């Protein structure tokens, strides 16, 4: 466990981790402070951060299991101590760590008798298990058991539908929430108009990421939500014919994209593939999945189009522009 004495700065706003510990493979704890804040700011930030930590961070879960030996999810398999329902519940609790996008397949294939744990799951390279000792089932007889698994990355909850069975595959309730709990508290100091606040933020995670990583991702997601309000090229929103529709102004770096198109010849763009741009792997994969293969494909999309791509962030657009301007 790491613990620091809290020293309050009276100058620049800063944050610091003052306590960090690992209680188990599936329980991490971190305590952070942000100071100095003006009166009222700590509560504003604390509420927003807590909601972002609990609802805006993606997690990876097993969402479906399939086996030819399972007639329905409340049946029993000969030679298996647990019911199918209990096995599905155990799979639901497996904690995974990954940066995958989309869906991946995994497999359990064992021969009894013996105990089946998370260690027996054959995973794709992009996924790893946080706690290999998590129990799945007990095989009491000399039988072969194979279970196919589907793994997804998402946020929030995914509740199974009882009638959503596909070819003897069974959906599993998934909780895509790496942060198990988050609390904030406020300490005030000073008098009168000089009164200031310290924000204390406590974060508990399931081990798939650290509290510090969770804080970083939640902060980034909050920034992405607020960026549309930071436009500088237009001061007001313009209502279209439909008064319920609002056209958002362009992003501040829109002119950079326009200037880039003017400087370079579009004829050459179609012969430059995004493979040549040395993009970060995540950005490259997002573009590929959206059928963007060449520089021409890329520049034919506006920045608004790009940020609509799944798992694509606003800062990724700026990063792409920075790379293109160097070419």
From Swiss-Prot:
Primary location group: plastid
Map out region (Alpha N-terminal domain (alpha-NTD)) in residue numbers: 1-233
Enzyme Commission code:
2.7.7.6
One Pfam family assigned to this protein is RNA_pol_A_bac
Which SMART domains does the record match to this protein?
Answer: RPOLD
Q: Where in the cell is it found?
A: Plastid, Chloroplast
Question: Could you give a single Gene Ontology term from the biological process aspect?
Answer: DNA-templated transcription
- Quaternary assembly: In plastids the minimal PEP RNA polymerase catalytic core is composed of four subunits: alpha, beta, beta', and beta''. When a (nuclear-encoded) sigma factor is associated with the core the holoenzyme is formed, which can initiate transcription.
Q: What does this protein do?
A: DNA-dependent RNA polymerase catalyzes the transcription of DNA into RNA using the four ribonucleoside triphosphates as substrates.
Q: What is known of its domains?
A: The N-terminal domain is essential for RNAP assembly and basal transcription, whereas the C-terminal domain is involved in interaction with transcriptional regulators and with upstream promoter elements.
- What is the official name of this protein in its record? DNA-directed RNA polymerase subunit alpha
What species does this protein belong to? Draba nemorosa (Woodland whitlowgrass)
């Amino acid at each position: 466990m790491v613990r620091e004495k809290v020293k309050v700065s009276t100058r620049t706003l800063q944050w610091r981790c003052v306590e960090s510990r690992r209680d188990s493979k599936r329980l991490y704890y971190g305590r952070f402070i942000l100071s100095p804040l003006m009166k009222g700011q700590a509560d504003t930030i604390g509420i927003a951060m807590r909601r972002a930590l609990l609802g805006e961070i993606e997690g990876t879960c097993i969402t479906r299991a399939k086996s030819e030996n399972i007639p329905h999810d409340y049946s029993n398999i000969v030679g298996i101590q647990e019911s199918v329902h209990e096995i599905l519940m155990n799979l639901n609790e497996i904690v995974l760590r990954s940066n995958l996008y989309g869906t991946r397949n995994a497999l359990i294939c064992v021969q009894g008798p013996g105990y089946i744990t998370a260690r027996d799951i054959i995973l794709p390279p992009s996924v790893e298990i946080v706690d290999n000792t998590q129990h799945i089932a007990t095989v009491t007889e000399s039988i072969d058991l194979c279970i196919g698994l589907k793994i997804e990355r998402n946020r929030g909850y995914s509740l199974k539908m009882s009638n959503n069975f596909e070819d003897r595959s069974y959906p599993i309730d998934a909780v895509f929430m790496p942060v198990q709990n988050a609390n904030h508290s406020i300490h005030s100091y000073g008098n009168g108009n000089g009164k200031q606040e310290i924000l204390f933020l406590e974060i508990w995670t399931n081990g798939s990421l650290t509290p510090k990583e969770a804080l970083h991702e939640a902060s980034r997601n909050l920034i992405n939500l607020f960026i549309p309000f930071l436009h500088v090229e237009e001061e007001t929103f313009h209502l279209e014919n439909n008064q319920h529709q609002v056209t958002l102004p362009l992003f501040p770096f829109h002119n950079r994209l326009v200037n880039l198109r003017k400087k370079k010849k579009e004829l050459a763009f179609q012969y430059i593939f995004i493979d040549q741009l040395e993009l970060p792997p995540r950005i490259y994969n997002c573009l590929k999945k959206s059928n963007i293969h060449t520089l021409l494909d890329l520049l034919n999309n506006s920045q608004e189009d790009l940020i609509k791509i799944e798992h694509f962030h606003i800062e990724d657009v700026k990063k792409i522009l920075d790379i293109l301007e160097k070419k």
